[in-house]
Swiss-Prot record:
The gene is DRE2. This is Fe-S cluster assembly protein DRE2. Residues 195-228 are annotated as: Disordered. A motif (Cx2C motif 2) lies at residues 317-320. One of its GO terms (biological process) is iron-sulfur cluster assembly.
Amino acid sequence: MTVSRDSLVLIHPAVTQQPELLETIEKGSILSETTIVAQYLINKLNDGTISPDDEKYDVIYYVTPEKPEAIQFPPKLIPVLHKTLKPSGRLYGLSDTLKVDALINGFEIVSNNGSEYYWVKESREKKAPVSISLKGNMKNGASAPVALPSFKKLNKTQPIGSSPSAGLAVSLKKLPTFKKLTKKVSAIKLTDSDLEDDDDDLESDDSANNSKTKFFDDFDDPETGDSIDEDDLIAETEEDTITMIQCGKSKQRRRKACKDCSCGLKEMEEQEIESRRAKQQQVIKFSEEELTEIDFTIEGKKVGGCGSCALGDAFRCSGCPYLGLPAFKPGQSINLNSISDDL
C-alpha cells in the first residue's frame, strides 16, 4: 500500500487568463500521483497574507506561463518554501536562474538531461560514522596479524648501536647560539674629503646648466641662427584648407570693403544689396476676381466667394469669406458705431 503524498500548487497571476495551463499540469504525471491540499496565488504568499505550515508538503509545484530562462520569482520565498517542504521533498517549476539561491537555502538541484528538473530538500539525517576494528579476526582458524614494529626514544647519553651499559656516550651536536647586540651604532660622520666631493658634484652640475643656456642663446641669436617664419610651417597644397576673405590691397580682414578696393569685395557686397532689394520689390498683386473675393464693399456682389452666402445673411457657412462680419448692404460704410451692438 502506497502512502499518499500531499502537494501544494502556487499559481502565477497570469495563469488566471490561461486556465488550460493549470489543468494540464494537474493532470500530469507529477501532481496526479499526489493529493493537492491547497492552491494559492504567489502574490498572497509574497505579501504575507498566507503563511503555510512547516514540513507539511511532499511536493510544491509553481505554475507560471513564463519561459524557464525568463522566470521572475521572489528570492525571499525560497527559504519559506524550504521550511514548508518535508525532508526529501521536491519543488517543481523553477529554473537555473535561481540556482545560487537554491543552493544557499539547502536545496539540491536534480536535472535528468533536461527531461525533468526539480529541487530536492536535503534530508537532516546524517550517516553515523562507521567504526573499523583494527584487531584481527580470529574466527575460522585465521592466523593472527603481524604486530607493527615499536620504536623507542633515543637517549642522549646512550651510545648508538650498543646497550645502555656501555661506557661510551655519544655527544650530540648543539645548535649555535647568538647574542643580542648591546652596543649602540654610532652615527656616520662626514670627513673633509666627502665634503670636497659634494662641492665637485655641484660645480659639475652648474657647468652643465651653463652649457645648455649658452646653446639656446646661440640658437636664438639672429646672427648665428636663422629665425623660422610661421607661414613656412604650413604645407602648401593645391587647395588651401584655410579660407579667409581678405582685401587684396590692405591684406586685412574687414567687414566692409574699403573705398579704393580692387580685389572684388566691393562688387560682391553690391550684388548682395541688389538681390535683397529685388526680393523686397516683389509685391503680391491680386486680379479683379481675387479682389472681389476679398473686398466685400463692391456694389452688385450679393453672394460671397463661397457661392451660397449673401452679404445680408446673419449666419454664414464655415467657408464663407464674410464669416464673422455683421450683415450689411453693398456699398455701406462700416464703422465701430454701426457694429457696437454686435460687439
